[in-house]
Amino acid sequence: MKERIKAICLEKPNNVVVKEVPYPEKSDNDVLIQVESMGICGSDIGAYRGTNPLVTYPRILGHEIVGRVIESGIGMSDGVRVGDRVIVDPYVCCGQCYPCSIGRTNCCESLKVIGVHIDGGMQEVIRHPAHLLTKVPDNLPIHQLPLAEPLTIALHALHRTTLKSGEHIVIIGAGAIGLMAALAAVQYGAIPILVDILEQRLEYAKSLGIEHIVNPHKEDDIKRIKEITSGRMAEVVMEASGANISIKNTLHYASFAGRIALTGWPKTETPLPTNLITFKELNIYGSRTSKGEFEEALDMLATNKINASHIITKCIKFEEIPSFISDLSDHPENYLKINAVF
């Protein structure tokens, strides 16, 4: 066994390096996983910029992680064995608080997200709770598999709002999560309307079959959404950008008796016209991380309902992660999704 392994460590804001760290030690309830592939997430970029208040430094990054189980632990599901390829559920809950007691473990009062609150999976070998694993399908390339994690975030918002066939859903933000939410909405039989200020992302979404795209910088967004929905506005709105103005706009985009999922994380407080919440009797749902969506996400990728190659802009080597984190921070418009492999 190696005494030290390579890891991607964020020493402080704007300083991310490949460094050696001790080989992980596991408890009885943990597994050890030989990491094979990983995704770079927006939260990694926020940590790099120093804008994520939940991150402390130094921190090993990464929560979109796929690899092979090399040591078993108590609590592994019956279908997982040593040697199996798995994706990790990166949300570690206490199991004791009120949200955990009602099955809403993603709302745990002391939730620990790997790569954010505790060290993450961008390293050669990781220790992880044995019960937080899902076996992955055999028919997907290794570099595509980490995409299932951000897809669970998109699916969770659709589930929170109980999106139904035939409904319109406005999705604000045409990044990876917003685009996958739109593609998943099509699979649900719903009608997505994708809103963004980056025209190239909207045009790309249209090339993938998203018929309705709206750029508020180029047209009257309220008027256009009203036209698409025959005057009703959208029964469901998902906010996936975290921009304050976009959060405010959810109240205008939603129909009377509409439902809103807030998925994006704003950096500052957002003043809202709360009279609209009462006037329209809107249901507003926080949509944090995910809960129980990994199997559906993996199935969507494995059956090509969502084509991973349409989302992943670039696949890089592990050692290239620091330079691409820097470039992604400086030029986010150039990449939809970057995944890495060993």
From Swiss-Prot:
Entry-linked CDD domains: Zn_ADH7
Pfam families (alphabetical): ADH_N, ADH_zinc_N
Cofactor: Zn(2+)
Entry keywords, A to Z: Metal-binding, Oxidoreductase, Zinc
Cofactor note: Binds 2 Zn(2+) ions per subunit.
Annotated SUPFAM superfamilies: GroES-like, NAD(P)-binding Rossmann-fold domains
Record carries keyword Metal-binding: yes
Keyword Zinc belongs to the record: yes
Superkingdom assignment: Bacteria
A GO MF label: oxidoreductase activity
Binding positions for Zn(2+) 1 per the UniProt entry: C41, H63, E149
Similarity section: Belongs to the zinc-containing alcohol dehydrogenase family.
Protein name according to UniProt: Uncharacterized zinc-type alcohol dehydrogenase-like protein HI_0053
Organism: Haemophilus influenzae (strain ATCC 51907 / DSM 11121 / KW20 / Rd)
